Every structure is written in structure tokens, then in C-alpha cells.
Amino acid sequence: MRVLITCFAVDSHFSGCVPLAWALRTAGHQVLVAGQPALIEAVVRAGLTAAPVGVDHAHDQMLAKVGADILALHDDRDYLEKRHDRLGLEFLRGHETVMTALFYSKVNSDSMIDDVVDLAYGWQPDLVLWEPFTFAGAVAARVTGAAHARLLTMPDMFLSTRERHLSMLDRLPAGRRDDVLASWLDSTLARYGHGFDEEIVTGQWSINPMPEGIRIDTRQPTVPIRYIPYNGQVPSIVPDWLREPPGRPRLCVTLGMTARTSNWSNMIAIEDLFEVVAELNVEVVATLSAEEQALVPDVPDNVRLVEHVPLDVLLPTCAAVLHHGGLGTWATAAALGVPQLSLGYMWDAVYRAQRTEALGAGLALHSSDLTPARLRGLLARILDEGSFRHRAGQLREAMSAMPSPNDVVPMLEKLTAERG
């Protein structure tokens, strides 16, 4: 098969595509990754073949200009069932309007979509796998007749709320069923002589790495896939000190890569964080950029500062991990059975943190509730209470039972033959 993977230019979203891309390659299939120019270095670093499309989006810069009001729309993005009573029609309509205008249409610009369609016309993929917000892949598949599927990297909050929104619209008179996302995609497809249907936002099926207990079920056909840690965003080198067992419980502290390269700031001042961990009887490994390290005047004796360290090697040596709520860190800790304290502050990070706490595999602390005292208390719990390690082990077992990327390839071959 020829498989085209499309992803907008955010490295953390692309990282979740890499293990399956390589499983397809090692099974003998041709794989081509299309992304905006800013993504190409990450694609090449993964050893994959890249095709630049469109121009770089300016989503982060736009958010900085729009201001805190738009960010606040995401800040309480709690999609647990107990909160669905607040997700009424007007809220969902407003949310989709904002997301379409300020996110979906920005990371899927006309130039990007045109280039992906032209690429697909020339290369003729059998299957298009698209990151779930990169609708350019679905458009290209529709125009060229390829099979296509969403390659999820997070719980499917988008589709679950989309389904809820559509069910509310269906109860309205025909003249009041405004669907901003559908209208934008319909006008886009019309440029190529095609029209919109819901398959453009759902894919023909979805590939989902979320385990039971974290996964959000929808009406969409789904192929489960095991999460495989990938460290390709940073130098993946094991330092000498990591080859020796720690002398006391080790705590990993990581605030992720996205805050280093975008307008998403850290959720806690580094000085406050170090004040908390300095009082704990633990060895702390904190991953901070050189710029962040330079801003810290005093480093506690029990803290080791590093710029980069492969998490899938570090975390098995740790009693717990304190992190920002990002998908890669969360999933790596979950796959390795490490208890986690997540400082999630928006959208899927909040959901994952709360579900992990509900499973007993970790604790959640929303950034709006974050104080040194609360952080200190939760760290003491997650380090001292053995139940977190036990429940984290159960989450690891659930993830290990899912099919590996290699095991998923035959299913993709079958579905492509049926749908393409």
C-alpha cells in the first residue's frame, strides 16, 4: 500500500503517529508524511519521508493577539459525564464556531489543503491517515478516492461532543441547524467538485490508543492500538547517572516540550516548584530547557537538572512523575505503570488527569487550584500511598493488552481493501 499521513505542524501531535508509520514501513508499505514546513524537521528526524505542504500556520501567534478570553474557553474543558448537563446547544455551537474560525481553518489553510490534494493526486495513496484535526487529509482522500482514517493521539473528546452537538441540531427546525464546521468543510470540498458529509470529520474509522477507563467511546468504528513511547523530539541518549539505581525514591518533574516552543506557559513558577520538592525525601530529576535553568538562582541539593532525558528509560526508575498533563508524558507513564500527578489545565489534559485519578493510578491538580501547599500534600500522598503504584500497574496491563502497531497493520490492510 501507499499510505499518506497528514499532520499539522505541532511536534507533539506528530509524535503519536511515528510508531504506526514505522510499523507500516517495516511491513513493506510506502509511507509519506505531509505537514507544514515547521513539521518537516521532526518528520525527517523520525527517519520518515516528508512532503512540505502549505505555509506554516500562526495559531500560537494568533492566540497571543486574541488574548486570555479565548484561552479561557478551553480552561474548563471538562467532558466527564457528570458535567454534560452544562454542554448545551448554545455552548457547543459557540465552541465549534470559535474552534472552526480560530483553529481548524487556521491549521488547515487553503494553501495546505490545496497542496495535500495535489500531492494525493500525484502520489495516489491507497490509505490516508490523518491526525484528528488535520482535515486536509480527509479532503484529499475524498477527492482522490482513497480510504482514510483518523489517527487519534488523545481521548476522542472532539467526536463525542460533535455527536452531542449534532443530536441537538437534529431536534431543531431545518432552518436553524447552523453547523459552522460542516459549512466550512463543504465550501472547501466544493472547490474540488465534492460535498460534505460527516465522514469528513469522523474518517471511515479511527485508530485509538486510549485504554479502557480513559477511552471515550463514540459511534465511530475503531481500531485499538497500543501506545508506544517515542522520544524523537529530543536527543534520546541515556546519561551515565541513569544507569545506576537511585539511592532514595526518585521523582521525575517535567513540564513538557510544548511550553518551550509556543505561547503555552508553564503552570507553576519553577522557584515555587523547587521550594516544594526541596522538603521531600526524594531525588528529583527535573527536565528544564537551558533558558529555564538560567532563570533559577538556587537549585535544591536533591534536584538534578537536565535538558533532555528519554522518559521511557527514566520513568521505570521513578516512584512517581509530576507533569504538565501532556499526552506523551501521560501515556508514557501509564504504559510503564508509574503513578502520576498531573497539573492539567485545559481540554484533554484535564480529562486524562481526572480519569487517571478516578482509576486510582494518579492524582489531578488543576492549574487554577495550584498552590505550593496543595502540591506538597498531593506529592506526599502519591509518593507514600502504595495503592497508586498498584492501580498504575493495572493501567499498564490494560495498555499492554492492546494490539501493537505491528499487529494493527493487517487490520488496516483489510479495511483499506474494503473501503478504498
Name each region found by the language model:
Residues 94-182:
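Conserved nucleotide-sugar donor-interacting segment of glycosyltransferase catalytic cores
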